[in-house]
């Protein structure tokens, strides 16, 4: 009988392709934990944080969370180039992040803080290019601090895809991109149902419970 097993190679090890939706799931299956902000298996892949980058032979560097596994792929998850790219991406996020870690409610449970430590970020080589904005305290259930948002999109997808509400979304483009309610209103003015699901997936102190 012909062998129909499909495999790919991760760091020199042959791995069988099963029901995994993307390379990140394949990599996690063999016990390798790549850094990531914006990936949740129950939400659509977004690929914004650029931390789960891998090298795919013949294709270059790709986001593992948004790349489907294919038979014959040869993948490398760790190299000097990948480590430097991940470090730069964290530094860029920190450059526009309100760094008040000691007093932040998410201190020591903040994904950004933990990844900065893990990736060895000791200094930030980039300048802040965005201006800090007022904190939104209008909601009875949560506080929204746009100055701690890393644009991972987790809250946007959770609100839209799981809750079916869409109270918040991306606004503007490029370096002016932000996550906010429609027309940049406060949360109390839009169809937020105060479910708290956005708080659960937020990796930083941008959304916190009251």
Residue ranges and their predicted role:
Residues 22, 154, 197:
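Residue-level recognition of oxygen-bearing side chains
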Residues 12, 40, 144-146:
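Aromatic-flanked redox-active Cys/Sec active sites in thiol-based oxidoreductases
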Residues 9, 28, 117:
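Short polybasic/polar patches that bind polyanions
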Residues 2-12:
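Eukaryote-biased recognition of intrinsically disordered, low-complexity regulatory segments
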Residues 12-14, 183:
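Short, well-ordered turn and helix-capping elements at secondary-structure junctions
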Residues 50, 54-191, 200-210:
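Fe-S ferredoxin-like electron-transfer domains
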Residues 15-71, 81:
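N-terminal cofactor/phosphate-binding cores enriched in small/glycine residues
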